[in-house]
Amino acid sequence: MPLTEDQQKRPPSAGISVDDVGRSTRSAAPQPPHASSQEWLPALLKRILPSTPSQVVQRVMLTVLVASVVILCIANPIFRQSDNLLNVLQQAAMVGIIAGGMQLMIISGGFDLSVGIVAAAAGCAAAYVSLQHGIAIGILVGLVAGLLAGFVNGILVAKIGINPFVATFGTQAVVTGLLYAATGATPIAPLPSGWTDLGLKNVAGISFASLTFVVVILILLFVLRCTLFGQHIYAVGSNKEGSRRAGIHVDRVLIAVYAIGGLCAAIAGILLVSISGIGSPATGTQWALLAIAAVIIGGTPLTGGVGGISSAVIGILSLTVLTNALNLYSVSAYWQPALTGTAVLLAVGFEAFRSARKR
């Protein structure tokens, strides 16, 4: 049938029905974004913002540390000198390494009061053996001594079931007596010149002790975050009986953790020998308490099951910056223990307050 004149003049679109127009409009309209694309911001904030009291304490202490460093750099020209900043890092190295090992023990639900005297004993053992058999053999003997002391502590805590405070306090007393009897309470000196050569080594101005500190911290960080053993440490610290029922060898985990703590103490003691050039039985008397204080100030509670290596690093750097600032402003060293104790009380009190509010 031929088209009429009106039909020939009508545009092609006029033949489209209303339903067709509606369907095309709906198909062209932008669709709402998928639900997952709307959830990225809350997920990101959950990862960034602290969600537990210990994380809050850690972020607060990190903020205080950064602010203190910035203020001291502005207020004191000596503090911001590169030599002084590198000196701060070296001063933090020995106790920082011990604090790294202490962090693992505290996460597992314990701690070690003997690490200071173990560090001194390992240093003296390394120094004494090096006189007859060379520095390399001396260092090896010192490391084995620290590892053995930590292993004994682990056996006392895990296998015999002695409270960590009692076990490590007893170990501290035994090692102190043996060390002073063996050395006559006198330093071991003079030592081969290779010791001081080792202590003076540096890379781009960063001392050997500081580099060792960084390497040890990175290794411990990897162990906690990237290994099954690290997951077991958290599990044991959270619930020992539950971990046993889950098939975790709790005793092995605890023994390994205390052995690592003893090894870290030995590394610190040997580093001190390389810096000072002597093996002294009187060194490290306050290292255990400083290491525990550093972990607590960094935001890790003594309850176990939570925390990270960053807590130990933040804590020890905070204490070292405080000590350095006191020295720069000629404040008596007697104030340092009082200020350290105050920082510990504030950190623990703040965490307890946050926990009470959440309940």
Regions found by a protein language model. Give the residues of each.
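Transmembrane alpha-helices
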Residues: 249-273, 285
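Membrane-helix/interface signature in polytopic inner-membrane proteins
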Residues: 219-259
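Transmembrane helix-bundle core of multi-pass membrane transporters
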Residues: 160, 164-227, 253-256, 275-284
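Alpha-helical transmembrane segments within multi-pass membrane transporters and channels
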Residues: 133-172, 314-315
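Structural signal for alpha-helical transmembrane segments and their membrane-water exit/capping regions
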Residues: 64-81, 108, 179-187, 222-228
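Transmembrane alpha-helical segments in multi-pass inner-membrane proteins
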Residues: 265, 275-341
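Single transmembrane alpha-helix segments in multi-pass membrane proteins
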Residues: 67-132, 155-162, 292-295, 299-309, ...
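Membrane-interfacial amphipathic/re-entrant helices at transmembrane-helix boundaries
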Residues: 3-99, 132-137, 248, 256
